[in-house]
Design a protein with these regions (language model features):
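Beta-strand elements of repeat-based all-beta scaffolds
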Residues: 4-691, 695-700, 705-710, 715
Length: 715
């Protein structure tokens, strides 16, 4: 937080009287007001204030914005907007640093000269092209830089033609293919990027996108009900299989493997969602249309539901899992008439160890398992913890933020229960300052250990420093960590000091260029010092460290080989590193297919990066799933010729036609299972076995995270 000075200071602003302008000032911590008179801002701490001046033309349109003293060297950062004869935004100039300006309006010609000098280019604006019609639709965008000016993004418009788009409708039990849209029924927008990769979207007269097309034959359909709600998404491989006119029920293999399904109730709530290859996720809502019950595919096999309770402000109070012993239809009707609202209660009336009522009981529910509990507004819930409450109660610490007396509207505590032992839980208590910034967090873990974090924040919520203590179950300190952050006047992190047990110290130092991008990062006084460079688009082109340099290429060649890219894909890269005896240079050239997917990578060496010993090629299906991979090791010949086999989008088998080579210490794929399928999945799409790696079982918890991995040998 910026220091409060004892006397009022000011920062000069050279405002242009012949222009309309608005000045916005963000003051540092400690300042509560400011006065602007004769072009000067006066306030306590105003020397660290940030001023933004927006100049307007005679029609009230913003034409120039100056962020006063924003850059690392204290220069103003200017950006401009130009308009065409129809009043449309035509050109947006690149942000450009201008020294000694103090918010003054800069003549466009002067701005242009300054920008050219800074960037070393002539096309220093983003230019939008419009069609010559009253619709004023965008037909092109030219990004900054002479190279990108010659390779614009384009857009074209038309209507659909006869037989071009299939017409799907929703039937009583699925999707029905009924024919094709008549000519002129859909608006078509074709967008092409800088590398000629195009995509078309087909929109109906209600403004709904009914189909997108990327390249020939890559069609994705979106199907809506009579209320305009999205009900089905049919990816290309699903559409390819639905070539016959007729009905395709939800149980159809194509829809189960590829389609996205959404079901709604009469209030418009999404009550069912099915992802490709998974069982449906069921959702139930209460009278206030809040989600109160959900059930995924794995829970269905045990008839379990995750249930959520709210307070009167619709804040989540607690969640638990239970078996209601009722059908989804009965539960939906029951919940539709109820409000799942609970409130704080004494321990003898509440769920044990929770502190909330349990008024709305599901019919015949059993096997309750508490999952999470949230507390708000105050800290009266600490009585639940008994003797442990003393460790969780607020304790002030000199030099760190002080807790405010009221926490109204804020989350004050959480309980998270162990999924394997429902009697154990972790509890965390949050304390805030008067601005709502967290200044202290106290946690008791499932193991019984404690963790206390103290923090000090500025008015923007940035953490200036923090101190964390790790204590054992008896409250004895085992490890401490301290962090101190320093920010510049623009709110950018410039330094972080980290210490363990108040002795082992590490520091990170960050520097920024004039546009606010990180330009260097230093660790431990220069032990590691990474520098970054960017091109006109803001893409990283070079990372340089003490013993390592990496260059990334986009629109320019690495040596005299390869194909450049203009849409942001990396066309090549190389890296240089030093050993005790030599300097090693390696690199890769990349190619992409017609759908903008990585198609190959060729290793390159030598001064002109013309040759290499290794390359890999990739092939995909229409959903972007890899189906073939070829690895060639030059002198070592073919390393891998791998084939992927799928059920829907889930890989079930991978084969290597080359087999194990065992030469030159090759890092090759080893296919250990030669007896049928390799991979198996559960109802949520989690992998449950990988026989190629001798993994015969993987078990997941309620969060779909693996908790047990069993190998064939029993380990």
């Amino acid at each position: 937080m910026s220091a409060i000075v004892s006397a009022a200071v000011d920062i000069p602003l050279s405002l242009s009287s012949e222009k309309n302008y608005i000045v916005e000032v963000v003051l540092p911590g400690g300042s509560t007001s400011a006065n602007i008179e004769d072009g000067r801002i006066t306030a306590e701490g105003a020397s660290q204030a940030l001023a933004t001046v927006v100049y307007y033309d005679g029609l009230g349109r913003p034409e120039q914005t100056s962020r006063v003293g924003f850059t690392a060297t204290g220069a103003d950062l200017l950006s401009t907007v130009s308009y065409d004869e129809a009043g449309r935004e035509y050109r947006q100039g690149l942000p450009t640093p201008v020294s000694g300006n103090n918010g003054c309006y800069v003549n466009p010609s002067t701005y242009g000269q300054t920008a050219q000098s800074y960037y070393g280019d002539t096309y220093l604006y983003r230019e939008t092209l419009y069609e010559n019609s009253p619709l004023s639709r965008t037909v092109g965008v030219k990004n900054p830089g002479a190279v990108w000016n010659a390779h614009p993004k384009t857009a074209a418009y038309r209507c659909n033609t006869a037989g071009e788009v299939v017409l799907f409708r929703i039937s009583s039990d699925g999707v029905q293919r009924v024919g094709r849209y008549t000519p002129g029924a859909l608006y078509v927008t074709r967008e092409t990027d800088e590398d000629g990769i195009w995509q078309e979207s087909f929109t109906d007269k209600s403004g709904r996108v009914v189909m997108t097309r990327q390249g020939n034959g890559y069609d994705t359909y979106y199907i809506y009900d009579d209320h305009g709600r999205l009900c089905y998404v049919l990816p290309p491989m699903a559409v390819d299989g639905m070539y016959n006119t007729g009905n395709y029920p939800d149980s159809h293999t194509l829809l189960q493997q590829y389609a996205y399904l959404y079901k709604y109730d009469d209030r418009g709530n999404c009550i069912g969602k099915r992802l490709p290859g998974c069982k449906s996720i069921q959702m139930i809502y209460d009278r206030a249309n809040r989600l109160v019950m959900s059930q995924d595919g794995n829970q269905q096999s045990e008839s379990l539901w995750t249930i959520t309770k709210y307070d009167a402000l619709s804040r989540v109070l607690y969640t638990y899992e239970a078996n209601p012993l009722r059908s989804p239809g009965d539960l939906r009707q029951y919940c539709k008439e109820k409000l799942f609202v609970e409130e704080r209660a004494d321990s003898y009336t509440a769920w044990p160890g929770m502190g909330y009522t349990l008024r709305i009981l599901l019919p015949a529910a059993n096997d309750y398992r508490l999952l999470t509990v949230n507390y708000y507004d105050d800290y009266s819930f600490l009585y639940i913890e008994g003797t442990a409450a003393s460790q969780l109660a607020y304790r002030s610490k000199e030099g760190y933020g002080a807790a405010y007396s009221s926490a109204k509207g804020l989350l004050t505590g959480t309980q998270v229960f162990d999924l394997t032992d429902r009697s154990k839980y972790a509890i965390t208590v949050y304390y805030y300052d008067e601005y709502g910034n967290p200044v202290q967090t106290r946690t008791r873990h499932v193991s019984g250990d404690y963790e206390m974090t103290y923090a000090q924040c500025d008015l923007s919520g940035n953490i200036l420093k923090s101190y964390t203590e790790h204590l054992d179950s008896r409250g004895r300190l085992s490890v401490s960590e301290s962090v101190e952050n320093t920010y510049d006047r623009s709110g950018r992190l410039t330094r972080t000091d980290y210490a363990v047990n108040d002795s082992l110290s590490t520091d990170w130092i960050y520097e920024y260029d004039e546009l606010g991008r990180i330009s260097s990062k230093s660790i431990d006084g220069g032990l590691t010092h990474a520098k970054y460079r960017y091109n006109l688009q803001g893409w990283i082109t070079r990372i340089e460290d003490v013993d390592f340099v990496q260059n990334l290429y986009y629109e320019n060649f690495m040596g005299n080989y390869g194909k450049v890219r203009y849409n942001g894909n990396i066309s090549a890269m190389n890296w240089t590193y030093r050993t005790d005896t030599d300097t090693i240079v390696n690199g890769y050239r990349f190619t992409y297919d017609a759908y903008d997917r990585l198609a190959s990578a060729y290793s390159v060496t030598g001064s002109d990066f013309s040759s290499g010993r290794y390359h890999v090629e990739y092939e995909y299906d229409k959903h972007g799933n890899m189906v073939n991979l070829y690895r060639n090791g030059g002198r070592g010949g073919m390393i891998d010729e791998m084939n992927w086999f799928y059920e829907g989008n889930r890989v079930v088998e991978i084969t290597d036609m080359v087999g194990e080579q065992g030469r030159y210490d090759m890092k090759e794929y080893r296919d250990y299972n030669h007896n049928g399928l390799d991979y198996f999945y559960d109802s949520n799409g989690n992998m449950t076995a990988d026989l190629d790696r001798d993994i015969v079982a993987i078990r997941y918890n309620l969060l779909n995270l693996p908790d047990t991995v069993q190998f064939r040998n029993g380990s």
